[in-house]
Amino acid sequence: MRIITGNQPPKADTHYSVYNVDGKYINSIGMRPGNIRLTDLRWEQVMDWNLGWNIGLFNDLLTADINLYSKQTSDLFTNDPKIPSTSGFTSLPTENGGDMKNQGYEINLSLNRVKIAGDLSATFNLTFANNRNTITAMDPIRLAAINGTGVNVPDNGEYMTRVLLNNPFGALYGLRYKGVYAYSYDHFDQAQAEGATCPVARDANGNVIYGPDGTPMQMYYNYTQTKYAFKGGDAIYEDINHDGSIDHYDVVYLGSSLPKLTGGFGFRLYYKGWSLNAQFNYRYGNKIANVARMNAEKMHGSENQSTAVNYRWRKEGDGADGSHVLPRALYGAGYNWLGSDRFVEDGSFLRLNYLQFSYGFESKLIRRIGLSRLSLYVSGENLFCLTRYSGVDPEVGYGGMGVTTDNATTPRAKSYTLGLTATF
């Protein structure tokens, strides 16, 4: 079924000219414009469809709910778009900034109370879903305001915000981290002899680039402005265009914050009066910027640091043998913690969300004490999580224009419950 609905502008009175009483002029009350009248502002239009099936097989022993959906939003509202200050204002309240499409599916499968052997029976459930969003159109001025001028240089602790047409929100953009320079530029000959890394520019084939004077071209951070010369112990970032400068030309796509698959599964086993209920949830295929680890390894300020920094670069030649070392400590200086794939991790996980073990007493036993039902149970929540993510909890919220970042938020608590249920 296809339906067109809409949303009214999020801020009121934007189609009127508003004047505010402010100050005085020649001993009279002064007034000034309070807004810019938006004569072209339109309702946001949403056109969506949903196709679903409810299936039951073998007398509903196996059931399935399948849903496919698509949602196309036109004249999408974007808040506080920047405008030239010559207008007397720095931004508009809102505007119709673009179009976006969301589409995906959700499938729920259930196997209901199937007999396994004797008094043992079970139920099973499985859910998996996928949602993809795509920016199909956006006002060029708004797009430029989000993405910058195109010459924005990545900085320490920052991942670039990018919105590209026909791409999803939540994409991660940054540099590619390639390790640590074992030697400084002045030790080029020694580095060459050992086959070790040194901050010199190389072409696409890995050959050293030499300048007009016959000396190797040194690697810099943002050569045209900052002109910071990389040294031994500094982080190596891939020079995508092989110009000897790490800058905006070297920013690449690092992955999406949106998972490829989300869902859960579980089972419940029954044996006489006993039952075991286990429920899992999972997420697969999303990327997380582990900013907590970044801050714990940056060695840039006076904050507490991870024990991993004990294995940092300290002297010329450290790491030349291929051993893993972190970049050197540089208090308040350097560019060793730029937003790169060094801190981007796979956020996939499998979590045992709930587990309950219970026993229901037989009716003939409990009727003697005036009860119609009595059961005892013990349960636990968030009992374990299987993941390769190095942070405290991979279940980080995602969605919106920004990237998914983990700033050491408080993880979900693990809990246990012992209970008794009685019915009179």
Say what each PLM segment does.
Residues 73-74, 255-257, 285-287, 394-396:
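A short local loop/turn or secondary-structure capping micro-motif enriched for an aromatic residue
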Residues 125, 249, 259-273, 353-358:
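Conserved SET/PR-domain catalytic core that frames the SAM/AdoMet-binding pocket
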Residues 6-21, 142-146, 176, 180, ...:
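Membrane-proximal, glycine/serine-rich, low-complexity loop/turn segments characteristic
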Residues 94-101, 144-159, 163-169, 254-264, ...:
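C-terminal extracellular loops and terminal segments
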Residues 229-232, 283-375, 379-380:
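Extracytoplasmic gating/loop element in the C-terminal half of outer-membrane beta-barrel translocons
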Residues 114-255, 297:
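Conserved small-residue
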Residues 1-165, 339-424:
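Extracellular/periplasmic, surface-exposed regions of secreted and cell-surface proteins
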Residues 31-32, 243-248, 332-341:
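Short glycine/proline-rich turn/loop motifs
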